[in-house]
Amino acid sequence: MDSNTVSSFQVDCFLWHVRKRFADQELGDAPFLDRLRRDQKSLRGRGSTLGLDIETATRAGKQIVERILEEESDEALKMTIASVPASRYLTDMTLEEMSRDWFMLMPKQKVAGSLCIRMDQAIMDKNIILKANFSVISDRLETLILLRAFTEEGAIVGEISPLPSLPGHTDEDVKNAIGVLIGGLEWNDNTVRVSETLQRFAWRSSNEDGRPPLPPKQKRKMARTIESEV
């Protein structure tokens, strides 16, 4: 096993522990707590994949961080912080919408890279909007936290979420996954639109009908993909 993979996991475990202690003091805001929950799932998945104990890794990560801090001057820390672009956390969904359980009458699931796409194929002839919570850096989507598809009545009928065991994805991965979800929902004569915020930062554009600028060939490909897997 690569040593960098192990040490990265150890540091992530310790930093999560620090953030959890911060949250336990009721100091974290909603985006902070949301990321904390999802990072916990990710760490569990990585720990299982690597065969590493989280508690042991946390202790090792503490030693690594302490060693770095001992060598770090205040001036170097200021320069490092100034050189890193700041990311922003954007929310289409409330915490209730993100944490709500939902069920599928005709479940369909597809994995695209490090993203899991789920949808209810029993949904037909509905107006659906895609909402997402995600981080943005340099005016481009950086990390998808969660995307869900809602009917006008507020029911959840689809979802795109990162796989805890496969962290890391690009904005192109997210756009491709959205294309798959749209293709699957439209196959049953649903009308799908994407939130203006998501259009703006994923595609850097927006359409009045809420449709992202998917090329016709890509849309046909997405529809065929869903059809072949039914």
Curated annotation (Swiss-Prot):
Residue ranges, annotated region (CPSF4-binding): 180-215
Motif window: Nuclear export signal: 137-146
Region named PABPN1-binding: 223-230
GO molecular function, one term: RNA binding
Motif Nuclear localization signal mapped to chain: 34-38
Subcellular location: Host nucleus; Host cytoplasm
Post-translational modification: Upon interferon induction, ISGylated via host HERC5; this results in the impairment of NS1 interaction with RNA targets due to its inability to form homodimers and to interact with host EIF2AK2/PKR.
Chain segments carrying region RNA-binding and homodimerization: 1-73
Cellular compartments per GO CC: host cell cytoplasm; host cell nucleus
GO terms under biological process: symbiont-mediated suppression of host cytoplasmic pattern recognition receptor signaling pathway via inhibition of RIG-I activity; symbiont-mediated suppression of host gene expression; symbiont-mediated suppression of host mRNA processing; symbiont-mediated suppression of host PKR/eIFalpha signaling; symbiont-mediated suppression of host type I interferon-mediated signaling pathway
Residue numbers spanned by region Disordered: 205-230
Keywords per UniProt: Eukaryotic host gene expression shutoff by virus, Host cytoplasm, Host gene expression shutoff by virus, Host mRNA suppression by virus, Host nucleus, Host-virus interaction, Inhibition of host innate immune response by virus, Inhibition of host interferon signaling pathway by virus, Inhibition of host PKR by virus, Inhibition of host pre-mRNA processing by virus, Inhibition of host RIG-I by virus, Inhibition of host RLR pathway by virus, Interferon antiviral system evasion, RNA-binding, Ubl conjugation, Viral immunoevasion
Record's comment describing the protein's domains: The dsRNA-binding region is required for suppression of RNA silencing.
Role noted for this protein: Inhibits post-transcriptional processing of cellular pre-mRNA, by binding and inhibiting two cellular proteins that are required for the 3'-end processing of cellular pre-mRNAs: the 30 kDa cleavage and polyadenylation specificity factor/CPSF4 and the poly(A)-binding protein 2/PABPN1. In turn, unprocessed 3' end pre-mRNAs accumulate in the host nucleus and are no longer exported to the cytoplasm. Cellular protein synthesis is thereby shut off very early after virus infection.
Family that this chain belongs to: Belongs to the influenza A viruses NS1 family.
Subunit structure comment from the entry: Homodimer. Interacts with host TRIM25 (via coiled coil); this interaction specifically inhibits TRIM25 multimerization and TRIM25-mediated RIGI CARD ubiquitination. Interacts with human EIF2AK2/PKR, CPSF4, IVNS1ABP and PABPN1.
Protein name per the record: Non-structural protein 1
Gene name in the database record: NS
